[in-house]
Amino acid sequence: MEAAAMAVTAATGALAPVLVKLAALLDDGECNLLEGSRSDAEFIRSELEAVHSLLTPNILGRMGDDDAACKDGLIAEVRELSYDLDDAVDDFLELNFEQRRSASPFGELKARVEERVSNRFSDWKLPAASLPPSSVHRRAGLPPPDAGLVGMHKRKEELIELLEQGSSDASRWRKRKPHVPLRIMGGEMQKIVFKIPMVDDKSRTKAMSLVASTVGVHSVAIAGDLRDEVVVVGDGIDSINLVSALRKKVGPAMFLEVSQAKEDVKEITAMLAPVKSICEFHEVKTICILGLPGGGKTTIARVLYHALGTQFQCRVFASISPSSSPSPNLTETLADIFAQAQLGVTDTLSTPYGGSGTGRALQQHLIDNISAFLLNKKYLIVIDDIWHWEEWEVIRKSIPKNDLGGRIIMTTRLNSIAEKCHTDDNDVFVYEVGDLDNNDAWSLSWGIATKSGAGNRIGTGEDNSCYDIVNMCYGMPLALIWLSSALVGEIEELGGAEVKKCRDLRHIEDGILDIPSLQPLAESLCLGYNHLPLYLRTLLLYCSAYHWSNRIERGRLVRRWIAEGFVSEEKEAEGYFGELINRGWITQHGDNNSYNYYEIHPVMLAFLRCKSKEYNFLTCLGLGSDTSTSASSPRLIRRLSLQGGYPVDCLSSMSMDVSHTCSLVVLGDVARPKGIPFYMFKRLRVLDLEDNKDIQDSHLQGICEQLSLRVRYLGLKGTRIRKLPQEMRKLKHLEILYVGSTRISELPQEIGELKHLRILDVRNTDITELPLQIRELQHLHTLDVRNTPISELPPQVGKLQNLKIMCVRSTGVRELPKEIGELNHLQTLDVRNTRVRELPWQAGQISQSLRVLAGDSGDGVRLPEGVCEALINGIPGATRAKCREVLSIAIIDRFGPPLVGIFKVPGSHMRIPKMIKDHFRVLSCLDIRLCHKLEDDDQKFLAEMPNLQTLVLRFEALPRQPITINGTGFQMLESFRVDSRVPRIAFHEDAMPNLKLLEFKFYAGPASNDAIGITNLKSLQKVVFRCSPWYKSDAPGISATIDVVKKEAEEHPNRPITLLINAGYKEISTESHGSSENIAGSSGIDTEPAQAQHDNLPAVRDDYKGKGILLDGRCPTCGRATKIEEETQDRVADIEIQTETTS
């Protein structure tokens, strides 16, 4: 809340940040403010601080219908004044020394404050929140009684089946399907069914001939009991023109069905269908109906309430009005439930209680009474519109679970509540109310139009506005009903011209808050909007910049929020974006395994545009916009969105004042974007030209020459630029540069002059290297170079002391510079899909904050903690330079992606290096490769390491004698991994007392039935075997060892012990190796047997001398593992060793 109080908001404008900026100006002795100007600034600051102190707790912290407050004349004046004051401060700071001495920047603003704020502030009171009667809240989402329940029958049957028969869907969640537009584009097979009164075969032949001659039609047939249906299958069919032609030449045709052809439908259904269990069938005792406002949640719940009511001894239908907290109406809701339950079956829905709760004692009394009354009864409880999880917890507590067939139905528009219900209760089935299909949506809209008698005047083909309404409403029943009704009211003004038609539809959209016939729809949307805190409303209103045909890119929107001053940190903004998803305002499509995209329902966008207009927050201009209205507005345009098809010449020809516009977003290819008069935008801070294909290098150079010096955000993603011009250096205040998906191949040296740059995003470009001037960007906290040909990062990245996020995903980078350890504020390092397998050990200095994304998964690897300070303080300066050759941090491992990075000693060694023993005793994890055995003194050193929790031992050659682990030391060790041809190891009594995980990676070798002794590992929980994919799991050395472990696992006191054996039994090579001869070495690289480098290392130690192997150090023939080949991690399957208990 403290951060939100200092941000730009839709209600208070730039009031909070401009007060901070004004205070800094007054405190800066080098600004050369004249005495008169200083006095003006101090007066303004004093007056506005008093206003801010009043508004902050009363507007920022409260929910509900505060439109009366935010639209109040004084608050509106303060809001506009804050923007002008912000501009005035920046205007003054751009002046040179001499100009400042003669400037009077605040004189006019002081007069405005005196006249319009100070004189009215003394007796001004904050307008009270005006909430409509609670009955309005309950009924706002219901369609009119005569609207008909089009499309509800299928939902009703599905829900009744769930309640009566249960579900075999193991996911317990029926997802809504993505909306398919009414017009199915070319290339996709579609099925269209028309109903036409055809009295004889002549009219049928005429209809079939007409349809068969239509472009895209593959087949046509007559169907229906009365042979009055025409079934058409094809691709790219213009269904609107076809139905218009049938009406003109055959008779009054109407749509019965518009869908994808059967083959495609089957495929899509299979893709969207949840995973179902084969044998299980679960009883469904509670259904959570989830959906958008106006989606039919309450309507279908009411239908179920009446359809099933006679099957239950008592039934309840209770609604909950939204509030800022769960407490105000909860007691009344409980009383309502109790009263209805006692009445038994009732035909009248409850009337909301308007009073407030009378304490927890009464609440608990009601809970106890409801629970006692329902305990022995078959009940149907419907709770409509849950807004707070705490509400549902209390209500759920009052409803007892019994075996008498009681059922509970709840509705909510909040994804977060549905997800928590799904997680917390296995009896809950989440049913997402999907959109009406195109057939039902068309029938509903066209039926309303024809019922009013306006069907003949509504237009045909492309001029049929019902077509536009169906596409805009995305199958939302309430929107279809009320927008179609509003269309009837506007029917006389419809014309044939395309632009006129768009303007009429735009007029209906823009009138959601004003047109009386749309009031029920507006009230339904207002419930969710007013339930948001102000900071979320501000972020949501900014989304009105999008057209309903646009998909929202999460990163792009989040970064614009930051540039606008609504949020300060990207992580915070990401959290807010997720909150808008949870509250149902932004819809996410896709899942964790596919591309995610986001959108806002077109009706919600229209509502947000109307709200934005009330605050003078953002102005949208697109095809069909009434430019005269925008030009004649008495308010200045603060933020402007130009949408596809808008003629930008209007900006120059109209009297529209954009000199105070701080944000310009151009969506899609507007007409002649290079003709946008950027010189008119004198105070622009945010410029987004992304995905505009007409922007090229020459245009960008001209744009940079015209741009305001105070631009903070420049979005050029998806444009056709090939280089960044030198003129960009003038953008001294640029904070976010987004040039991804362009054709640029280098960053200019001038990039170093952008001292305030915070985010640099060059993903999906042809950039091959970062310039050395990158070191000058001391404010940079996000560097994203993913999907570029960059193969090396310069050491200068270590100078970026404020860097928090570095992404080199899907690049050619193999190794990170050691200077990365100097990035003390780094929080996220993304090296997925690269050859980076290790980090320099210096990265351990930032382990407490750093999260590493490695491999090809999204699971983060935490770096080892608790040893950084000891490492730094315990290593002499002269020795520290050599440590890079001795130690690194492995983030990708042959055993699988570790959850915690492991300190790794590169290369192969005869013994544990002396430097490790002298300076790295404090390590919490260690991965080392030895040539053929673990010497006694080395084992003693490992056993006495005080913090060692994870140990990985790898052996180049097969140890001649088993390595014995006795009961001394290893007190902290929890994970032990052995990488050897065959695991020659034996655990004695009380060995490794806290070991929980034992893991083997092995290949092939002589069979042995020697005991391993896992029964002596008292804390053991899991044993994992990973066999090399080049050898069969039934090779003698492998199968014999597995058999030994299986037998010991059956005898372990902790049984059952989980045993994991790799499931990759299929041969990767046509040649398998089952003997101990000619076997691949167990190096860090899986190579084909013919390429093994160390297959025949002698087993006798003396023979190593002749092969260049140092007795007291590394084996130089192995080298440092910097060229580890990428490989797919072994898959493992669970095999639980079950033992029969003996009596």
From Swiss-Prot:
Q: What is known of its domains?
A: The HMA-like (RATX1) domain is responsible for the specific recognition of AVR effectors.
Any idea what this protein is called? Disease resistance protein Piks-1
Name any one GO molecular function.
ATP binding
Asked if Coiled coil is a keyword of the record, the answer is yes
What highest taxon heads this organism's lineage?
A: Eukaryota
**Could you give a single Gene Ontology term from the biological process aspect?**
defense response
**Chain's role:** Disease resistance (R) protein that specifically recognizes the AVR-Pik effector avirulence protein from M.oryzae. Resistance proteins guard the plant against pathogens that contain an appropriate avirulence protein via an indirect interaction with this avirulence protein. That triggers a defense system including the hypersensitive response, which restricts the pathogen growth.
Keyword entries, A-Z: ATP-binding, Coiled coil, Leucine-rich repeat, Nucleotide-binding, Plant defense, Repeat
Q: Which family does it belong to?
A: Belongs to the disease resistance NB-LRR family.
What Pfam families does this protein's entry cite?
A: LRR_14, NB-ARC, Rx_N, WH_DRP
PROSITE patterns of this UniProt entry? HMA_2
Domain NB-ARC, chain residue ranges per copy? 282-570
Q: Where are the LRR repeats?
A: 681-706, 708-731, 732-754, 756-777, 778-800, 802-823, 824-848, 945-968, 979-1002, 1004-1027
InterPro entries, sorted:
Disease_R_plants, HMA_dom, Leu-rich_rpt_typical-subtyp, LRR_dom_sf, LRR_R13L4/SHOC2-like, NB-ARC, P-loop_NTPase, Rx_N
Q: Where is this region: HMA-like domain?
A: 191-264
Q: Where does the record place the HMA domain?
A: 189-258
Segments of this protein annotated with the region Structured coiled coil (CC) domain: 1-190
Q: How does it assemble?
A: Interacts with AVR-Pik through its N-terminal part containing the HMA-like domain.
> Known Gene3D superfamilies for this protein?
1.20.5.4130, 3.30.70.100, P-loop containing nucleotide triphosphate hydrolases, Ribonuclease Inhibitor, Winged helix-like DNA-binding domain superfamily/Winged helix DNA-binding domain
Protein encoded by which gene: PIKS-1
